[in-house]
Amino acid sequence: KAARLNVGLPAEGRIILFVSQKVTDERKGMEYFIDAIDRLVKQHPELKDNTSVAVLGGNTQLVCDRLALKAYPLGYVSDERRIVDIYRSADMYVLPSLEDNLPNTIMEAMACGVPCVGFRVGGIPEMIEHRRTGYVANFKDSADLATGMNWVLQEADTEQLGSACVSKVARCYSGQSVAMRYIEVYNELIALKRYIV
C-alpha cells in the first residue's frame, strides 16, 4: 500500500499495469489491450468496482479515456525508485506486444513479483511460463488476452505466481546467472577448439 500511495494510485482494489516508452506505439499492442479490457469488463462487470489500470509511458493521456476501467495516466517516469513503486503497486502486468525479443519490462515486473500476461511472440513465451509466472495468450487474440487477465485476477494463486516470478528472474536473468551462462559457452568453445586442433 505504501508503494501505491507514493505514486498516487489507490490503496485498495486491484491494478493492471501497462508500460511502454510510448504507449501509442502500435507495436506495443495498445489496441489489443483496450479491446481485451473491454471484453474482460463485459464478461465480468463486477471488476469495474475494484479494478483499475495504471498506464506508464509517453502519451498516456491519449489512451486512458478509451479504457473500460478507471485508468491512471502516470506519464513518462525516469526515477528508478518511482518505477519500482509503480511495478510493486500492480497486481498484474500486461504487455500485448506484437514484436519483442526480450522485453525488459517483463523482467522488471517479474523481479518485483508481478505476474505477467503477454502474447505468444518473440521471446515473451520464454520469459512468461504459462500459468506459472503468468499467462501467454495466443498472438493477436484479444479474447485470449482477456482470459489470461481474468485468470491472473480471479483464478490463480497470485502469491504463488509472484514468488515464481521472482525465482525465475533470479534463476535466468540475474547478473550472476547470465555470467555463468557466458562461462559455460566459453568453456564449450575452448573444449571444441581442443577437439578440432
PLM segments and residue spans:
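Nucleotide-activated donor-binding/catalytic signature segment of Leloir-type glycosyltransferases, i.e.
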Residues: L47-T51, G57-R81
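A short, well-ordered alpha-helix in the C-terminal region of glycosyltransferases
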Residues: D157-C172, R181-E184, E188
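Short alpha-helical donor nucleotide-sugar binding micro-motif in glycosyltransferases
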Residues: D85-A90
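A short helix/loop element that forms part of the nucleotide-sugar donor recognition site in Leloir-type
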Residues: K1-G8
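Aromatic "clamp/platform" in nucleotide-sugar-dependent glycosyltransferases that forms part
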Residues: L98
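Conserved donor-binding/catalytic core segment of Leloir-type glycosyltransferases
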Residues: P10-K28, I34-D38
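Conserved acidic donor-binding segment of nucleotide-sugar-dependent glycosyltransferases
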Residues: H130-R131, Y135-S142, W151-A156
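Short hydrophobic beta-strand element within catalytic cores of glycosyltransferases
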Residues: P115-G118, I128
